[in-house]
Curated annotation (Swiss-Prot):
<keyword id="KW-0436">Ligase</keyword>
<comment type="subunit">
    <text>Homodimer.</text>
</comment>
<dbReference type="InterPro" id="IPR050141">
    <property type="entry name" value="GCL_type2/YbdK_subfam"/>
</dbReference>
<dbReference type="InterPro" id="IPR014746">
    <property type="entry name" value="Gln_synth/guanido_kin_cat_dom"/>
</dbReference>
<dbReference type="GO" id="GO:0016879">
    <property type="term" value="F:ligase activity, forming carbon-nitrogen bonds"/>
</dbReference>
<dbReference type="GO" id="GO:0005524">
    <property type="term" value="F:ATP binding"/>
</dbReference>
<dbReference type="GO" id="GO:0042803">
    <property type="term" value="F:protein homodimerization activity"/>
</dbReference>
<comment type="similarity">
    <text>Belongs to the glutamate--cysteine ligase type 2 family. YbdK subfamily.</text>
</comment>
<dbReference type="GO" id="GO:0042398">
    <property type="term" value="P:modified amino acid biosynthetic process"/>
</dbReference>
<dbReference type="GO" id="GO:0004357">
    <property type="term" value="F:glutamate-cysteine ligase activity"/>
</dbReference>
<dbReference type="InterPro" id="IPR006336">
    <property type="entry name" value="GCS2"/>
</dbReference>
<keyword id="KW-0067">ATP-binding</keyword>
<keyword id="KW-0547">Nucleotide-binding</keyword>
<comment type="function">
    <text>ATP-dependent carboxylate-amine ligase which exhibits weak glutamate--cysteine ligase activity. However, because of the low catalytic rate, the question remains whether L-cysteine is the actual biological substrate.</text>
</comment>
<protein>
    <recommendedName>
        <fullName>Putative glutamate--cysteine ligase 2</fullName>
        <ecNumber>6.3.2.2</ecNumber>
    </recommendedName>
</protein>
<dbReference type="InterPro" id="IPR011793">
    <property type="entry name" value="YbdK"/>
</dbReference>
<dbReference type="Pfam" id="PF04107">
    <property type="entry name" value="GCS2"/>
</dbReference>
Length: 372
């Protein structure tokens, strides 16, 4: 399928997707009932969309195009009420978090969807293992060239986005020692990590043509890059965050990305070059492994900086942009999080260290989601 022309969208508009866990009490393992929930709510959603993701234990909540985080929060809140009621009616519960702490990937059923079934044929068991849960944020762009500039600019802050959203320390019943273990699941995919270097939209079109020769790529949705352009929507999509435990944190993360995008496209503070990516995977690993306690390295100077310190510097830089687009509350909340040194991964570990079980942890996450 050829790459569509880049759809011009209003700059800095938002679209947010949350991949949620559908669980079965009282054992709190993943359920295989997302199709039933989607059927139950499809005529009750007035804004946004509730839809399938890869496997039957995943439920995606997606906003419409939103002007700001307040509009997105309102849509999510309304969807949440409908979904929670449907889950209660079917004796199910819903929660966030980047991974389910003890599910077995072998039990996961891929959705009866042509695209997902084709992906299963291409990638085999890797698709079942990809039963993990992330937050994706789309930001509108006026042109394809703007999208490429924005993608490279946001890529500098992938470690910051991962560390602030880290919520997947447990997997397959084990403490992984990672703050965010979810991104590791995609390491075997041939398109894992950053997009190959291009400097403008024309070069991206050539890159996509080359990738399509593999016969594994039918559309941009078949590419699993950390950040990717979405020409159909006219956006850049950031895909590195774990699904937070609360709607409020999800909205704050979206506000961070929207404000960073505004700063990048308004100020144009960087002259991007391929060398920017030399240490990309090392810095990304630091964020996944250690969260905000990680250390990132500048590929041009060799300077090493604590991720906490660099995140505070980013929040300070983008504060004026956040004010202009109505995202100041998000930046202030994230600033408090960084200063406190807490993230959701550490709170999960604290719960278990205090004697809680992994079953109890999922139950608590369901209570947090329902009470947010």
């Amino acid at each position: 399928m050829p790459l569509p022309d880049f759809h011009v969208s209003e700059p800095f508009t938002l679209g947010i997707e949350l991949e949620m866990q559908v669980v079965n009490p009282p054992g709190y393992d993943l359920s295989q009932d997302s199709s039933m929930l989607i059927d139950a709510v499809k005529n009750k959603i007035t804004a946004g969309e509730v839809k399938h993701d890869i496997t039957e234990s995943m439920l995606e909540l997606a906003t419409d195009v939103c002007r700001d985080i307040n509009q997105a929060a309102g849509q999510f809140s309304a969807m949440q009420k409908v979904v929670l009621q449907a889950a209660t009616d079917h004796h199910l519960e819903i929660c966030g978090g980047g991974t389910h702490p003890f599910q077995k990937w072998q039990r996961q059923e891929v959705c009866d969807n042509e695209r997902y079934q084709r992906t299963l044929e291409n990638f085999g068991y890797l698709i079942q293992q990809a039963t993990v849960f992330g937050q994706h944020v789309h930001v509108g762009c006026a042109s394809g060239d703007d999208a490429i500039y924005l993608l490279h600019g946001l890529s500098r802050f992938v470690p910051h986005f991962i560390a602030l959203s880290a919520a997947s320390p447990y997997m397959q019943g084990t403490d992984t020692r990672f703050a965010s273990s979810r991104p590791n699941i995609f390491s075997a995919f041939p398109d894992n990590g950053p997009m190959p270097w291009v400097s403008n939209w024309q070069q991206f079109e050539a890159l996509f043509r080359c990738l399509s020769y593999t016969t594994m790529i039918d559309s941009i949705k078949d590419l699993h890059w950390d950040i990717r352009p979405s020409p159909h929507f006219g956006t850049v999509e950031v895909r590195v965050m774990d699904t937070p435990l609360t709607l409020s944190h999800a909205v704050n993360m979206a506000g961070l990305i929207q404000a960073t995008a505004h700063w990048l496209l308004t100020e144009r503070p960087f002259k991007h070059q391929e060398k920017d990516y030399l240490l990309y995977k090392f810095n990304r690993f630091q964020a996944c492994r250690y969260g905000l306690e990680g250390v990132i390295t500048d590929p041009h100077t060799g300077d090493r900086r604590p991720l906490t310190e660099d995140t505070l510097r980013l929040l300070e830089k983008i504060a004026p942009s956040a004010h202009k687009i109505g995202a100041s509350s998000a930046i202030e909340a994230l600033h408090r999080q960084v200063v406190s040194g807490l993230n959701e991964a550490q709170l999960m570990r604290d719960f278990v260290a205090d004697g809680g079980s992994l079953i109890g942890l999922v139950k608590k996450h369901c209570e947090i989601w329902a009470g947010d």
